[in-house]
Amino acid sequence: MKEIKAYIQRCCVNKVVDELEKEHAPGITIVEIHPVGYGYEPNYFGFQQHDAYKRYSYLRIVKVEVVCADRDVDRFAETIRRLCSTGSRGDGMIFISDVSDAIRIRNGDRGEQALTQPKETTCH
C-alpha cells in the first residue's frame, strides 16, 4: 500500500476530489495548511518581512491524502498532477510513501481489505 500526500492550491481541490472519486480512490482526506519554509518566497505577495502573519494568511494550500493499493498509486498521483499543473511556481508537490499496514477500527480488517468501502457506517 502507498500513501499519497499532495500539497496543492486550494482552487484545485474540488476537481481533484471529483476525479479521484470517479477513479474509485478508497478514501480522501483534505486538510487546509499554512506552509512555511521550503519553496516559499518571502515577498511573493509584496509584503514586507515584518508582515509575516499577514503573508502566511494569504497562502491557500491544501493537503490531499489518499492511502491506496500499490497498483493505483501512479494513476492517482498522475490525476492530481495533471489537474493541478499550470506550469507556474506554487503548483504544489506530491509525496508518495509506503504504508506497512492499515487497520479498520470497526472490525479489525487489515491491509487492502481495510481500504475497501465498509458495508455500513454508524457514528456513536
Which stretches of residues belong to each language-model region?
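Positively charged, small/polar-rich N-terminal and surface patches that mediate targeting and assembly
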Residues: 1-124
